Amino acid sequence: MQPQSKDPCQELHPLVSTLAASIRSSWQKLPELAPLCTADDLKAIHGELDGETLFIGNELYQCRGFRKIHLEIARLGNGLQILHCVWFPDPQYDLPIFGADIVAGPAGISAAIVDLSPTSGELPDPVFKGLEAIERPAFRQVRDLPGWGTIFSSKVCFIRPDGADEEALFNQVVIDYLEVLSDCASRANPESPTTVSTINRYEGQLNYCLQQKRNDKTRRVLEKAFDPEWADRYIELLLFDNPPTP
């Protein structure tokens, strides 16, 4: 694996760049934000897939209320681009999991999803009310969730944006969702690690990670570009690592 001569994050699809900037701006407002220690070989990754250069860049943080905040941007040659972001809460806090993903190619954005996913059956009441107050755009191409999509809330937004106008609207939806989450996080207090509610949220987050790992497309791409052992390490330790036992 060799570094590229130019910045692989240049010339990204406009929505990938815009959404990444929106997410970074949102996490700057979080309390006690600090970098999360990560193995050097998992921060900036270069490989090759089908003769094209694959780059994966990762940014990781933690803060009060969230055990891990992860933004991943991947690019394959001049074609496929992926933005993946997850904010995993500390199970002692009654907060949902934020998740957003974009898949872009030469023909544009094929998939865009954002959700605040519950870890204890249903969304916390302040989060649900906050999302209810958001005026959702009438996107023209709503996509069906995968079979393992039961982990998502009723407020999940999964679309194929139809043009630059809908791409801008989707970016605003993500900003709105993050504002709701950030506001709730600023007012949340930790519960004891031994309470039933904390344990339930821990188990709910375990299930979320388990279901996300069922996405075989991710594993196949990583195995082909690197090797099965490396792919397993990347998925288990970085993408969807289990929360620490309370």
Swiss-Prot record:
Keyword terms of this UniProt record: Oxidoreductase
Annotated catalysed reactions: (2R,3Z)-phycocyanobilin + 4 oxidized [2Fe-2S]-[ferredoxin] = biliverdin IXalpha + 4 reduced [2Fe-2S]-[ferredoxin] + 4 H(+)
EC primary class: oxidoreductase
Entry EC no(s): 1.3.7.5
Coiled-coil boundaries: none
Pfam families documented for this protein: Fe_bilin_red
A Gene Ontology molecular function term of the record: phycocyanobilin:ferredoxin oxidoreductase activity
GO biological process: phytochromobilin biosynthetic process
Superkingdom of origin: Bacteria
Family statement: Belongs to the HY2 family.
PANTHER family: PHYTOCHROMOBILIN:FERREDOXIN OXIDOREDUCTASE, CHLOROPLASTIC
Function as written in the Swiss-Prot or TrEMBL entry: Catalyzes the four-electron reduction of biliverdin IX-alpha (2-electron reduction at both the A and D rings); the reaction proceeds via an isolatable 2-electron intermediate, 181,182-dihydrobiliverdin.
NCBIfam families, A to Z: PRK02816.1 (NF002760)
Protein name: Phycocyanobilin:ferredoxin oxidoreductase
Species name: Synechococcus sp. (strain CC9902)
